[in-house]
Amino acid sequence: HDGFCLFDSKYTDFKSTNTKCGRDLVAEYVEAVRAEGLKVGLYFSLLDWFHDDFPHYGDRNHPMRNNPAYKNDDRDFDRYLTYMHNQVREICTNYGKLDVLWFDFSYDTLRGEAWKATELINMVRNLQPDVIIDNRLEVSGEGYGSLAAGNPTPYHGDFVSPEQMIPPNGIQDVNGNDIAWESCVTMNNHWGYCANDHFFKPAPMLIKKLVECVS
C-alpha cells in the first residue's frame, strides 16, 4: 500500500522505471508468465500512502494516522480517485489480456462507491471483458460482501477472498449456493517484507494448503 509502482505509470515518478533498476517489472512479469503458458494476474492496491490526497491522519491503516502534522485539511480525495482510476486504466490497457485483477482492499467508509466502484468496474470490464476480479472493492478479508449476502452490487466481483484460513466446507451464500473463493495465506506472518519474520511455513504445509484449496 506504499504507492510504489512496479510498472511505468505516467501519473507518478514513484515507480520502478525511475530507480536504478530502470525496468518495468510488470511488463517483464507478464511476458515471463505467458512464455510458460500461465495465466496473468495483477494486484492493485486501492490504498496509496504515498499520495498526498489519500487520507493520512485518522485513517485506520495509514502509518501517519496518529500524527497531527498529517491532518487532511488540504487533501482532495476526488483528485486521488482520478489518479487511481487512471492507473487502473493503464494496467488494463498496456499489458495485454489480463486473466485476474486483484484489488486490495476496502474498510470503514472507504468501500464501494467511496472508490467510485461502479465507474471503475465498468471501465475494467470494458477494457478487459474476460478478466476475473476479486470482491475487495466492497470488503476486505474480514468479510464476503454482497456476493455472499445474496444481493450483489455492480462491483461485487467474481469471488470472495478469505485471509489466513481455508474454509473446510467451501463458502456458501445466504441461500446455500456455493460461491467461488480464493484463500489468501502468507508464507510467514507478514504480507510484506519484514526483516525479523523468519517464521516461514514449511514446504509440506504449503503444499498441503494448495492441495486443500483445489480438492
What name fits each language-model region?
Residues 1-215:
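Mature catalytic domains of secreted/periplasmic carbohydrate-active enzymes
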